[in-house]
Amino acid sequence: MSRYRGPRLRITRRLGDLPGLTRKAAKRSYPPGQHGQARRKRSEYAIRLEEKQKLRFNYGVSERQLVRYVKKARAQEGSTGTNLLKLLENRLDNVCFRLGFGPTVPGARQLVNHGHVTVNGRVTDIASYQCKPGDVIAIRERKCSKQLAEGNLEFPGLANVPPHLELDKPKLNAKVVGRCEREWVALEINELLVVEYYSRKV
């Protein structure tokens, strides 16, 4: 399953607020479609699937990528669900979004893919790069790169930069100063349901 490129508000109407996907709010609170307002009891599978979809759409990863992250999270010590969230939060595109360099995760990914971002002084165009403590993320010393980032920083997607990131706004750079904690994740999600969803599939 490839990355979603369709109408984003249809997704937020079905799944709820996804800060990484879009900053717009849906006008209608019920799911799209002919039977969107119908009340029906959801199965346990449907609830788990919905939580999984929240994660996939918010961080803009494909199904195949998410499966890889689940496997990696299982191999690490500690809670699989928390490990999974940390892996997704540490992606370079998401870190750029949390810093305000991009208005959304897809917007931040475009900055990375087009070579506007450096990590430790080197241009890095791999959105899935795992940021770690000590890494310095900066906007490239080019007029077009700076203009894009400065424009986005005026209206960031999220109000607050998480404590594990230290932003120097005038210099358009930031440092990863610690590990991302569970409570700093902006998405409302039950990650245990995501782990349960994949328990029989992976």
Curated annotation (Swiss-Prot):
Nucleotide-binding is among the record's keywords: no
Region Disordered, residue ranges: 15-42
CDD domains from the UniProt entry: S4 (cd00165)
Matches recorded under InterPro entries: Ribosomal_uS4, Ribosomal_uS4_bac-type, Ribosomal_uS4_CS, Ribosomal_uS4_N, S4_RNA-bd, S4_RNA-bd_sf
Domain S4 RNA-binding: 90-152
Keyword line: Ribonucleoprotein, Ribosomal protein, RNA-binding, rRNA-binding
SMART domains in the cross-refs: Ribosomal_S4, S4
Molecular function via GO: rRNA binding; structural constituent of ribosome
GO cellular component: small ribosomal subunit
Single GO BP term: ribosomal small subunit biogenesis
Family, per entry: Belongs to the universal ribosomal protein uS4 family.
Subunit structure: Part of the 30S ribosomal subunit. Contacts protein S5. The interaction surface between S4 and S5 is involved in control of translational fidelity.
Physiological role: One of the primary rRNA binding proteins, it binds directly to 16S rRNA where it nucleates assembly of the body of the 30S subunit. With S5 and S12 plays an important role in translational accuracy.
PANTHER family according to UniProt: 30S 40S RIBOSOMAL PROTEIN (PTHR11831), SMALL RIBOSOMAL SUBUNIT PROTEIN US4M (PTHR11831:SF4)
UniProt-recorded name of the protein: Small ribosomal subunit protein uS4
Organism of this sequence: Synechococcus sp. (strain WH7803)
